[in-house]
């Protein structure tokens, strides 16, 4: 039993179970019950983790992990309204006891947001800020796609990806996301590798003439000005 990050680990396990069922029954779409309060909580949690732009706005109405489409149709709805509907329309509502346990970071964040609201936090303006960040994120995604299209070459059997030297001449965030996507694709993983590990690899690739490391089920190797990402056997 884990002693740290219990809710985060539990969430990851839930997704893994969902994905396995989806694979079994060939399901490509998953509807999730995240609401507006989850959106705000996720933003603050990501700030505490030191997340970048993509992490801050990671909870969206449509996300894709591998070949699975995650849809959140209730993301504009307030939690209090959904609870009201559950109790008064469906006559069915279950309270999760961990929602009141302040040893969990999410519950502490929930209390912080409530306090900020009492001190004048305007949720409409907060939501506008998140939406503005989403527009900025789309711009970065465009340049990531361009970097992957123009500066990577994949082998015939899709087991190796070759990155040219121009790949690493882009702005850092573009390099970071491009490399993260490359490792996830070749390693055939649902989730990207941890940011700190990718940062470390980028630093070595930029400074070293030759370099070899493993991450996310991949071997990352630099030979002169070329980087080769291949799947671990």
Where would I find each of the regions flagged by the language model?
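AMP-forming adenylation/ATP pyrophosphatase catalytic core
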Residues: 13, 63-67, 107, 111, ...
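Catalytic-core segments of class I nucleotidyltransferases/pyrophosphorylases
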Residues: 122
């Amino acid at each position: 039993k884990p002693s740290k990050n219990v809710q985060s680990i539990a969430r990851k396990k839930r997704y893994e179970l969902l994905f396995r069922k989806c694979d079994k029954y060939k399901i490509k779409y998953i509807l999730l019950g995240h609401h507006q309060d989850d959106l705000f909580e996720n933003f603050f949690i990501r700030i505490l983790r030191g997340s970048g732009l993509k992490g801050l706005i990671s909870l969206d109405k449509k996300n894709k992990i591998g070949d699975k489409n995650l849809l959140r149709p209730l993301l504009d709805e307030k939690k209090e309204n959904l609870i009201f509907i559950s109790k008064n329309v469906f006559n069915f509502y279950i309270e999760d006891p961990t929602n009141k346990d302040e040893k969990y970071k999410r519950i502490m964040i929930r209390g912080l947001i409530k306090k900020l609201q009492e001190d004048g936090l305007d949720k409409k303006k907060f939501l506008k800020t998140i939406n503005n960040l989403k527009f900025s994120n789309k711009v970065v995604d465009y340049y990531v796609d361009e970097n992957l299209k123009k500066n990577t070459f994949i082998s015939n059997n899709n087991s190796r990806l070759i990155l040219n030297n121009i790949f690493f001449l882009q702005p850092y965030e573009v390099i970071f996301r491009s490399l993260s996507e490359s490792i996830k694709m070749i390693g055939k993983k649902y989730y990207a590798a941890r940011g700190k590990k990718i940062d470390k690899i980028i630093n070595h690739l930029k400074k070293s003439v030759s370099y070899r490391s493993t991450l996310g089920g991949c071997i990352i190797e630099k030979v002169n000005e070329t980087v080769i990402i291949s799947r671990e056997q």
